[in-house]
Amino acid sequence: VAGINFKDHDGVQIMKDYMASGSFSRGRESINASAAMVFVGNINQSVESLVKTSHLLAPFPEAMIDSAFFDRFHAYVPGWEIPKMRPEFFTNQYGLIVDYLAEYLREMRKYSFADAIDKWFKLGNNLNQRDTIAVRRTTSGLLKLVCPNGEYTKDSVRKCLEYALET
């Protein structure tokens, strides 16, 4: 996120509007979509040091440092916990063609597994409406990846729900 730069000063407001309503306008045209926004962040110092002097959202550009903006995005992936790409991560064997994965992910957008939460868990009153929507959507998306046939267990839902609450 640190490398994001806005030439158009309305960019952050457009993103906030989209994250709140699922639509945004440019000129006379209104555009609707159903994708969530997830950001990947990296930090240039240790987590311990950053937390003592600032916060984990500090890498965001100044234009985005806004509680309304932070309340609206669905996840912040801690990039500092993701290993950097190395040659041993690649193979000369068979692999997954990304086109197939993209088509599968597009097809799975037709389904929601958010009701899986209600089968075993109850979200508390500490979540506001935006948080509840984000947690339900993130849990649903994760379940689509780990249990694509819709046959999930209480434990798989719990793991996805805990991750969704953390992000």
Enumerate the predicted regions with their spans.
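Structural recognition of the conserved hydrophobic beta-strand(s) that form the central parallel beta-sheet
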Residues: V1, S30-T53, A75-P78
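A short helix-turn-beta junction within AAA+ P-loop NTPase domains corresponding to the substrate/partner-engaging
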Residues: V51-K84
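Conserved AAA+ ATPase small/helical "lid" subdomain
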Residues: A36, R72-C160
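Conserved AAA+/SF3 P-loop NTPase catalytic/coupling segment centered on the Walker-B
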Residues: V1-Y18, N42-K52, A68-F69
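Long, highly charged low-complexity segments enriched in Glu/Asp and Lys/Arg with interspersed Ser/Thr
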Residues: C160-T167
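Conserved Walker
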Residues: N5, A20-A35, A58-D66
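Hydrophobic/aromatic-lined pockets within catalytic cores
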Residues: K16-F24, E81, C147
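Hydrophobic alpha-helical bundle architecture
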Residues: I4-I14, S25, S54-P61, L123-L127
